[in-house]
A protein has these predicted regions:
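Short S/T/G/P-rich N-terminal loop/turn motif that feeds into the first structured element of a domain
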Residues: 1-71, 75-102
Length: 102
């Protein structure tokens, strides 16, 4: 295990006219216990959010704040499916890490 041993990944799609608004909000957002955040553009309006956390407890503590944040940006997002809604989230322990930034 690594010192930073928990991550969450969220797939989402932005409405074409809301990209700027979304990034205005997300660039001002931080969560206690999240040590790194990445957003990859995977399609024209498709994105993948990756958060690295100090621990599973850290993300659990911030869950209410993350839900409040989602409520703030939900209107900027397209529904992925009726089952998923506007996000497709997963999270878990980091079991392998290769990189130069320790």
């Amino acid at each position: 295990m690594t010192a930073q041993n928990f991550m969450n990944v969220v797939r989402f799609k932005l409405k074409s006219d809301c990209v700027y608004n979304y990034f205005e909000v997300i660039d001002k957002t931080s969560f206690e216990g999240m040590t790194q955040r990445y957003i990859a553009k995977t399609g024209d309006y498709d994105y993948c959010f990756v958060g690295i956390w100090k621990s599973a407890e850290a993300i659990a503590t911030q869950r209410p704040a993350m839900i409040a944040h989602l409520d703030e940006v939900r209107g900027f997002m397209e529904e992925l499916s009726p089952e998923l809604g506007v996000t497709d989230p997963v999270s878990g322990n980091i079991v392998s890490k290769v990189g130069y930034h320790d």
